[in-house]
Amino acid sequence: MCGRTSCHLPRDVLTRACAYQDRRGQQRLPEWRDPDKYCPSYNKSPQSNSPVLLSRLHFVKDADSSERIIAPMRWGLVPSWFKESDPSKLQFNTTNCRNDTIMEKRSFKVPLGKGRRCVVLADGFYEWQRCQGTNQRQPYFIYFPQIKTEKSGSIGAADSPENWGKVWDNWRLLTMAGIFDCWEPPEGGDVLYSYTIITVDSCKGLSDIHHRMPAILDGEEAVSKWLDFGKVSTQEALKLIHPTENITFHAVSSVVNNSRNNTPECLAPVDLVVRKELKASGSSQRMLQWLATKSPKKEDSKTPQKEESDVPQWSSQFLQKSPLPTKRGTAGLLEQWLKREKEEEPVAKRPYSQ
């Protein structure tokens, strides 16, 4: 499933990250609809507004269906046939839509049949792994692998307007397949646009964290076909819905557990072996206290760093570890990215405690 995302880029930067080629091969930037409704956040939850890509043909008659618009929409699809005056009274969860029942449930089948396909944009999404033998859950941040280019020497470049058409080598946004719908209040008022994220069985790399994952559209061709309802039929588009292995992840702090927390700390990598945020009792607690006294609290430049093999074998049962090795190259790029943003932006507010 997918119940929390990060999408923190400023509006103009997000626009450049979504540059594309139209059907004529021309490089373009998507237009915005209701741009003031977009609110960047490191910690987006259902019922908040998130940016989605969709075909311009949904809003402009006779437009080229390959042209794109970015529109902030409510996360959690409100069906067009919903009769209540308050969308929060919807009695079922539409945050996600399973791919194996998408053509069975009216809430999703109807808008899909109308071509209401969208691409949900995010830095990445969060998922929680249940820790065996405890009530704790470890959060992870999941995203596309990031590549450092020779041109930039980092993960940020193309800062000036004249360069956006030539290269975008900043953070690669995660592009998730979604369905949207339009709901009109029975008593009149503004139309509410809302969406759901399609989910599939997890790929092998994520199966230890959760058994479901978003349907990720990997690459420009997949994104174009999913959006272009004028040229690509529903049956053809659904062939794009499947798990992808082109994904990476790292453990993050429990700060993200509280959806009110909106700081870079939400997606910053943490080391599960070093952190040891565990609950224990009795003799287990005393063992953990002993381990804490034997481990240096701060790395000393004169003290050689211990390798993981130096940890006593019997203590491994008390140390949480990632089920799969994190790709440190990608995590390192993320840390550089966060460090640069921290230097450029005001200091974030102190996180709320869970």
UniProtKB/Swiss-Prot annotation:
Formation and reversal of DNA-protein cross-link depends on DNA context. Catalyzes formation of the thiazolidine linkage in presence of abasic sites in single-stranded DNA. Mediates the reversal of the thiazolidine cross-link in presence of double stranded DNA. Its EC number is 4.-.-.-, 3.4.-.-. There is a cross-link at K148, K151, K276, K306, K339, K342 (Glycyl lysine isopeptide (Lys-Gly) (interchain with G-Cter in SUMO2)). The active site is at C2, E127. One of its GO terms (molecular function) is single-stranded DNA binding. Gene3D superfamilies: SOS response associated peptidase-like. A motif (PIP-box) lies at residues 332-338. The modification Thiazolidine linkage to a ring-opened DNA abasic site is found at C2. GO terms for biological process: DNA damage response; interstrand cross-link repair; positive regulation of isotype switching; protein-DNA covalent cross-linking repair; proteolysis; somatic hypermutation of immunoglobulin genes. Keywords: Autocatalytic cleavage, Chromosome, Covalent protein-DNA linkage, DNA damage, DNA-binding, Hydrolase, Isopeptide bond, Lyase, Phosphoprotein, Protease, Ubl conjugation. It is found in: Chromosome. Transmembrane segments: none annotated. One of its GO terms (cellular component) is replication fork. Ubiquitinated; the covalent HMCES DNA-protein cross-link is ubiquitinated, leading to its degradation by the proteasome. The modification Phosphoserine is found at S160, S295, S322. Residues 296-309, 337-348 have a biased composition (Basic and acidic residues). Sensor of abasic sites in single-stranded DNA (ssDNA) required to preserve genome integrity by promoting error-free repair of abasic sites. Acts as an enzyme that recognizes and binds abasic sites in ssDNA at replication forks and chemically modifies the lesion by forming a covalent cross-link with DNA: forms a stable thiazolidine linkage between a ring-opened abasic site and the alpha-amino and sulfhydryl substituents of its N-terminal catalytic cysteine residue. Belongs to the SOS response-associated peptidase family. The N-terminal catalytic Cys-2 residue forms a thiazolidine linkage to a ring-opened DNA abasic site. Glu-127 catalyzes reversal of the thiazolidine linkage; self-reversal is favoured by duplex DNA formation. Glu-127 is also involved in sensing abasic sites in single-stranded DNA (ssDNA). His-210 stabilizes the abasic sites by forming a hydrogen bond with the O4' hydroxyl group. This is Abasic site processing protein HMCES. The gene is HMCES.
